[in-house]
Amino acid sequence: MRSLLRPLGILFLFCAPLFAAAQDTSKEKAAMQKMYVDFLTEEGYRPEIDSDGDVQFKAEGRTYFINVVEDDPTYFRVVLANIWPIESEDERVQCLVAVDYSNAKAKVTKSYLVKDNIWVGIETFIPEAEDFKKIFKRCMSALNNGVTHFVSKMKEQQGN
């Protein structure tokens, strides 16, 4: 029995700091989630925490999410996922052209393929985590502008 306790004790000594760090990370993530949820609620949105721990909200019939990155609180990312399903290889090529066009034309946004769909997001660094409040409306406007550029290029290619 004694021979088993010693290795377990040593294992505990090495693992205890990892458990403490995980708890600190969850506290940081919860604090960031609360900050985003409180702000969005004040702005009239109805935010929820999604299964990944990100903050999801709807605006004008679209579902957005704010990526919660607890180990980099001054990184701010808001995403509109699944704006255009890719239904064929020909359409995939058109999407790549439209993504390139949108990325070249729209300020700050990134359009990209995720599996068989198009996502558009904003990624930026801010001095303090709370500073996202100062740029949120402009980010949403820019994000929607990126979507508009993507969709217009897709429609142009499809003859609409």
Regions found by a protein language model. Name each.
Residues L80-G121:
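Short, internal acidic amphipathic alpha-helical interface segments
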Residues Q23-K27, N82-I86, I126-F136, M140:
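Second-shell loop/turn segments in exported
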Residues M1-G9:
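Bacterial N-terminal signal peptides that target proteins for export
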Residues A129-N160:
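C-terminal partner/receptor-binding element of secreted or periplasmic proteins
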Residues E43-P47, A59, N103-A106, V147-M154, ...:
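Sec/Tat-exported extracytoplasmic proteins
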Residues A22-Y75:
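N-terminal secretory signal peptides
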Residues F12-A21:
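Hydrophobic h-region of N-terminal signal peptides that target proteins for export
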Residues Q33, V37, L96, K133, ...:
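Extracytoplasmic/secreted envelope proteins and their assembly/folding machinery
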